[in-house]
Amino acid sequence: VTIRRATARDAPDAADVWLRSFAAALPSVVRPRSDDDVRNYFREVVVPLRETWVADAESGIVGVMVLHDGELSQLYLAPDWRGRGLGDRFVALAKERNPGGLGLWAFQVNGPAQRFYERHGFVAVTYTDGSGNEEREPDVRYEWRP
């Protein structure tokens, strides 16, 4: 599996990974945007305007990570690719690209993500009731400092 910068032609597959991963990892979280809105967002914003990376396997795109302004804003893997070390590789790359530190948000219902980030040295610094995010889902702010 190769991790590389996303190109415009990766946007549809990266969006599909996001959609499948979100549905599998966060079944109780209500998304405020339709599948088509998510695909458009990846095509018009995420890939062209953010530092977007994809994990490219023989079968196609199996992971996506988005960095922006010192934030690890998105990290999603195809459900059948969890537990294979891709997330570890993405986080190592994120730290390499942001050696001064990183921040991120995770939903409180996503215990596996919280454990994953804590294992990688991220520390929970703020818990919210979700009123500040589109999903209105309680979340937690994590920070990593070298």
Language-model features: locations:
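Conserved GNAT-fold acetyl-CoA-binding loop/helix
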Residues: 15-44
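Conserved active-site tyrosine of GNAT-family acetyltransferases
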Residues: 117, 122
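A short beta-loop-alpha structural element at the N-terminal edge
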Residues: 2-16
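Conserved acetyl-CoA pyrophosphate-binding loop and the N-cap/start of the following alpha-helix
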Residues: 80-81, 85-93
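A short, internal acetyl-CoA/4′-phosphopantetheine-binding micro-motif in the GNAT/acyltransferase core
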Residues: 71-82, 106-107
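Conserved GNAT acetyl-CoA-binding A-motif
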Residues: 97-109
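Conserved beta-strand in the GNAT
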Residues: 54, 60-76
